[in-house]
């Protein structure tokens, strides 16, 4: 079963055409090849800090549940990797940003609550795993079928590198699913940075400037 975006409060989305894809995204499309996606019970994976959880994150999570659930025809599984404080420190140049993330256990609880609500219309189950490196279990688990990735160039490069790594290890490449950006009221995409800067709220509504 697919979720109605209007019912979840998602704002309009911005379509990313193939001519706008980064080099890595174009390249990984040639590497998909054989996968287990024909199976009714599928496993989709994605990862991030998910702090604060905003409508852009929700679009990614919805896509993961849709992919794993096979539109309601299978009992799939979603793996959500949550960035550890150590990984956040390694990958974020601004220490203030890392401090603003809050305790890992608190972030995990908030994410679990969100997943309970978002996953309700779907048949797939979910689990949250700790991410201590950028690839996480997606690089090594043979039971994973699909990766849900942001359209951001950095995320697409990692998806391409991940499939290269899996092929080198003798694993099937993952099918990559990339939902379009979710944009705020001003037509610019929703991001955690904009929320932290006080420009918008987690739903993309513009906040009054002082």
Task: Indicate residue ranges for each PLM-predicted region.
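Nucleotidyltransferase catalytic core that binds NTPs
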Residues: 1-210
């Amino acid at each position: 079963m697919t979720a109605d975006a209007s019912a979840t409060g998602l704002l309009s989305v911005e379509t990313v055409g193939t001519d706008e894809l980064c080099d890595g995204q174009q390249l990984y499309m040639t590497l998909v090849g054989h996968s287990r996606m024909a199976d009714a019970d599928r496993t989709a994976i994605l990862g991030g800090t998910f702090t604060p959880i905003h409508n852009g994150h929700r679009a990614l999570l919805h896509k993961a549940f849709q992919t794993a659930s096979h539109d309601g025809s299978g009992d799939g599984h979603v793996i959500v990797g949550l960035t550890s404080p150590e990984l956040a420190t390694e990958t974020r140049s601004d220490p203030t940003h890392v401090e603003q993330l809050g305790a890992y256990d608190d972030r995990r609880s908030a994410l679990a609550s969100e997943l309970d609500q978002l996953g309700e219309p779907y048949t797939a189950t979910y689990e949250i795993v700790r991410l201590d490196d950028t690839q996480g279990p997606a690089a090594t688990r043979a039971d994973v079928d699909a990766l849900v990735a942001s359209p951001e160039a950095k995320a697409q490069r990692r998806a391409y590198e991940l499939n290269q790594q899996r092929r080198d290890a003798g694993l099937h490449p993952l099918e990559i699913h990339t939902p379009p950006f979710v944009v705020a009221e001003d037509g610019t995409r929703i991001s955690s940075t904009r929320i932290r800067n006080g420009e918008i709220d987690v739903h993309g509504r513009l906040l009054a400037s002082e």
